[in-house]
From Swiss-Prot:
Task performed by this protein: The THO complex is required for cell proliferation and for proper export of heat-shock mRNAs under heat stress.
Biased composition (Acidic residues): 219-235
Gene giving rise to this polypeptide: thoc7
Residue ranges, compositional bias (Low complexity): 201-210
Subunit structure: Part of the THO complex containing HPR1, THOC2, THOC5, THOC6 and THOC7.
GO BP, one annotated term: mRNA export from nucleus in response to heat stress
Superkingdom of the organism of origin: Eukaryota
Residue list for modification Phosphoserine: 216, 229, 256, 260
Protein's name in the database: THO complex protein 7
Natural source organism: Drosophila melanogaster
Matching InterPro entries: THOC7/Mft1 (IPR008501)
One Pfam short name: THOC7
Length: 288
């Protein structure tokens, strides 16, 4: 009964607050209470009706009504505590999911940065692989080539051989020029000797003809023909006539032309033989 007396002033205050609440606030409270639609609103309405009935009754009413009110109030309180715990749990889960979202966003940003860096590393790795393949190819080609020092020695040897051959060529050219000059001089001398021999043979022939004329002069004197001295005969032979000019000079010119042709043929033959001999000497020197 003491508990009933203690709750009565509070009940009067609650009733006064409920009367003062307007319809909108009542609807908000009902929506907040009956959030999941499990009958909390009906339970509160029943509790409120019983409470108002119990408050309007006298103090000597049945205590069973009070126990029933306390039981329903405990159920409503338990439901409210459950709702509060649910709200706290939902808020905690919401904070947790918010943190997870932020964490995943940071992870996504880091993953994008890692992807970009991986792309750059991939490009660098491709370039390195390409350079390595080119290096291996060049290294294999260089490995197939002879050593630099050996190649340099071989080049120096070839240069010395080329210099020696150039010197030999110059010597052979000077030698060839000298022999050519000697050969030209020799052919000129031979030609001069041939001309002298031709002149000697012609002079001997003229002297023999003059001897024959001298032997026939006594017979001519006996027959009354003018005597001609040897000096007149020599003068006649030395003085050319128009017939001698017409017949003798072309004949001499043809002889000199034939001699020059023969001389050129012989000169070419001897020159070819000399060149062949010089080439043979050069081949022998190079082989040695």
């Amino acid at each position: 009964m003491s508990e009933q007396c203690q709750l009565r002033p509070h009940s009067d205050t609650l009733v006064r607050k409920l009367v003062e609440m307007n319809d909108e606030e009542i609807i908000k409270q009902r929506l907040l209470i009956d959030g999941d639609g499990t009958g909390e609103d009906r339970r509160i309405v029943v509790l409120l009706k019983q409470f108002l009935k119990w408050a309007s009754d006298s103090l000597d009413s049945n205590p069973i009504m009070y126990d029933r009110l306390m039981a329903q109030f405990a159920q409503c309180k338990l439901t409210a505590l459950k709702n509060v715990q649910t709200l706290q749990m939902i808020a905690g889960e919401r904070d947790n999911y918010t943190q997870l979202v932020e964490h995943h966003e940071e992870s996504i940003v880091l993953a994008k940065a890692e992807i970009e860096s991986s792309k750059k590393e991939l490009i660098t790795a491709k370039q390195i692989r390409k350079n390595k393949m080119e290096y291996d190819l060049l290294a294999s080609l260089i490995q197939d080539q002879p050593d630099r020092s050996e190649t340099q020695r071989h080049i120096e040897t070839i240069r010395r051989e080329i210099d020696d051959l150039v010197q030999k060529k110059l010597k052979m050219e000077r030698k060839f020029q000298k022999r050519r000059n000697d050969f030209t001089l020799l052919m000129y001398t031979i030609h001069e000797l041939e001309q002298q021999l031709d002149q000697d043979s012609s002079s001997s022939a003229s002297s023999s003809s003059s001897d024959c004329d001298a032997r026939s002069e006594p017979d001519l004197d006996d027959n009354g023909i003018m005597e001609v001295s040897d000096e007149d005969d020599d003068l006649n032979n030395s003085t050319p006539t128009k017939f001698d000019g017409a017949r003798g000079e072309p004949k001499y010119h043809s002889v000199s032309t034939e001699d020059s042709k023969a001389m050129s043929v012989e000169e070419d033959t001897v020159l070819e033989l000399s060149i062949d001999k010089d080439e043979h000497d050069v081949d022998v020197a190079v082989a040695n």
